[in-house]
From Swiss-Prot:
It comes from Nitrobacter hamburgensis (strain DSM 10229 / NCIMB 13809 / X14). Disulfide bonds: none annotated. Zn(2+) binds at C937, C939, C948, H949. This is Protein translocase subunit SecA 1. ATP binds at Q87, G105, E106, G107, K108, T109, D525. Its EC number is 7.4.2.8.
Amino acid sequence: MIGALARKFFGSANDRRVKGYQARVKAINGLEPEIAALSDEALRARTAEFRQQLADGKTLDDILVPAFATVREAGKRTLGQRHFDVQLIGGMVLHEGDIAEMKTGEGKTLVATLAVYLNALAGKGVHVVTVNDYLASRDAGWMAQIYTFLGLTTGVIVHGLDDVERKAAYACDITYGTNNEYGFDYLRDNMKYRLEDMVQREHFYAIVDEVDSILIDEARTPLIISGPLDDRSEFYNTIDTFMPNLEKVADYEVDEKQRTVALTEAGMEKIETLLRDAGQLKGDSLYDVENVSVVHHINQALRAHSLFTRDKDYIVRDDEVVIIDEFTGRMMQGRRYSEGLHQALEAKEHVTVQPENQTLASITFQNYFRMYKKLSGMTGTALTEADELADIYKLEVVEIPTNLPIARLDEDDEVYRTQNEKYAAILAEVERANARMQPVLVGTASIEKSEVLADYLKKNGYKLIDFGDPKSMRKLYAAARAGKPAKLFAVLNARFHEQEAYIVAEAGVPGAITIATNMAGRGTDIKLGGSLEMRAQFETADLADEAEKDAKIAEIKADIERFRDMVLKAEDVVEIEPAKGSKPAKTVTRPGGLYIIGSERHESRRIDNQLRGRSGRQGDPGRSKFFLSLEDDLMRIFGSDRLDTMLQRLGLKDGEAITHPWINKALEKAQQKVEARNFDIRKNLLKYDDVQNDQRKVIFDQRVDLMMNESVAETVADMRHAFVDDLVTKHVPENQYAEQWDVAGLKEELRRVLDIDLPVDEWAAEEGIADEELLSRIENRVDEHMAAKVGQWGPDVMRYVEKTILLQTLDHLWREHLVMLDHLRQVIGLRGYGQRDPLQEYKSEAFSLFEALIAHLREAVTGQLMRVEIVPPEEEQPVLPAMEVHKLDPHTGEDEMAFAQGNFAQASLAPVVSADRSSRDPGNPASWGKVGRNEDCPCGSGKKYKHCHGR
């Protein structure tokens, strides 16, 4: 209460921050007449002037005011749109690296141009991130008019481009693309073997559109590049045949709140019997070590059958199981559940079971976007997640005032006992709205629910619009002109993804009824009366004559103006019956505009707010209302059975609803609980992923360093010496008598790994030989062996072979390391039962695994280079092609062999240049530069560097 009083007098922190921008807004407005007087050429020349000012030492903040004024004028000249003052504030928030919360219809796409232009002047590339290819292409094409006018280049990254096209797009001043494409390009770049093949530049500045969707809803979804493993499709199908034999409660228990499923004792016994009969059980018990993978697959099959619902979590299309995004209702083509879950779903649906995949590279959006030096975002709904965005991404949410006040009426929820009663009430409300020609958008939580509602409408005489038939929408327009309901409706879910933008854009036509899953269609405005752009695109496509096109567009404009007026007047006038003995009946008028009907509450308040926000854009009137039932997922999970019993006792009849602000508050509390739990899950997962992310950075940075160096000879030599050093230390420990040395073991290891037979036993038998002397002799012989290869094939060939083997071996071992980290992560939680912190245990063991990876890398690279045989070309080739390296077979253990072909005389590979030795100061290690492990230590001790400062 005191806080509310203080905010009333002093304003909130958000109000104060917004107020702080007013001086710069005033300055930008003051420049408007001067800049408006410039010619097009003079306006375009300002870009070069700004860049020169930056080169002379000015900062981006110093030139913000004139740069924003320039963009505003360019917007007026190219798009006919002038940035409002509140849009200038939004642009400043984006430039400062925070999140601008702007309501639907406030022009977020146009706002981005301000910060994009300013930051693109730095010449390091600006990435604009959208949620799908359509929006990336649309926004790039639309806003490029401003950028091109001002002399900047614009590229777009969409699915299907080759590397040459991608590299060209990233080289532009401004690049538009989807979060998936940016993330996958980063992963693919770090699997390349030449710097010139990499497509991305540095991660300088990104603006994320629909930032809540990408940084929160998809934060837990890793991007994974994978390769196929052995085909085990028959095994999945066998396991799936067991599922109908299991009974819920008796054989397994489901926790819907936690999304987990577990076998009971009876279920385990039943599964053991079924496995034994099918010949799939090894040993006596299901939980014997040999059956660990079997138990895993049983659990995944159980999850597939009990936690995943067709047409809600996934759909089946063209013999494939396609995941549905739970937040947007969109199909996630190309995405697959990991750890065998997707295969279990394929077996459940009796489609072709695809082979399991091995992870080759992965990253989460959380870690990808945190790589940018500056990150900002835009959305209509972020305040409910402000704590998470600040905690994880260090992004502050700033609520930008609307240009015009919001005139939408948000009504209290209506709660019914059963889903059938709820759907009947929704149908009745839709019919009432349709009768007065008010457009209705019905939001559903899944494809399944959207199709249930569609069936209700069909049974009551409504027809589904066929978007494949161009005449379908004409019927809707004709009915609107006549002022009569057409009784037509559209469905927007994953099945109709292709027409998404068109369906959404026309949801504001009088009498339109649109059923949409969650926030499908985000990014496309619903304009009252319809969309001029969409209608013009479809209705003038077949017209070749320009005069005919102009006439058609004029006709469409007149239509839309009339339709908009109809929608605004579609008010709902209701006479409320008085209570007995009270005042006479009163009349309530509810606004026209777009009517949003929610068919159930989502787990997240933000998703509900997004649905509401589709109505009431730019000061238009509108209304929203949620219809709920005690059988809805959120209500059921949070104990609606108790409420149902109470309502029955109170005498709530079938078809009656309860409506009260208290119910809204109770639901909001339930949603807050779910949001808090999901935040904790995401935060905890990030802590684990950060461990892998730190290691990923080291490996990826190392790869880039290796590719930047034309020669890795010194790196390879260091690895060789380190491996030999470790090998000798293992078998010939320091401060031990020669009689205690494991000479035979050392000799055998040298033969096995390096394929070299050295008289180690004879050297060890020499009187007074020390371990350092033994090490020195072995290293010298190994170096001589490698020098002979260089002499035989030439330094250019060996440099090429060394780099290729080093990079490919690093990739091979990194992939194996990822698998081990995944396995470790799955079981580490059990350490909690032993009173140990699973996260600390994971960090410790992951570090040990990483150390082992480095040791294995030294051994593998050294061994391969010692054994490598190079096949000479049969005839002269004009260019040096790629080398093929045959990797170690993990099953047979056969050695890797590298084969190179081509004219090696043309290779122009130079050795790594170390620091000038004459400039080394013995007392200042910082002046030594890179020192070889076998060089004398620059400190003057007389010892080798590896035994002195290089230890």
